[in-house]
């Protein structure tokens, strides 16, 4: 799992926007018992993910073949969680831009 300070959010609506030049992107999140739900929007297309896991794991979410050029990723904490989760944490541990 990537190590570093990461970017943490627990509050509903907390958002980070990343603009990159490439063909794709990999986002590494920490999934564990405190994991919440997150919305990831890539070039205007949104999808929700659940970051809960019964033990700590690296959750890799990736997008490839976006086409060479500039792309925008928006990561938004939804402030919700599934039954069994003890938190609403969204922790982006690392990202990697895929070359064109």
Name these PLM-found stretches:
Residues 1-100:
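Glycan-recognition surfaces in beta-rich domains, encompassing non-catalytic CBMs
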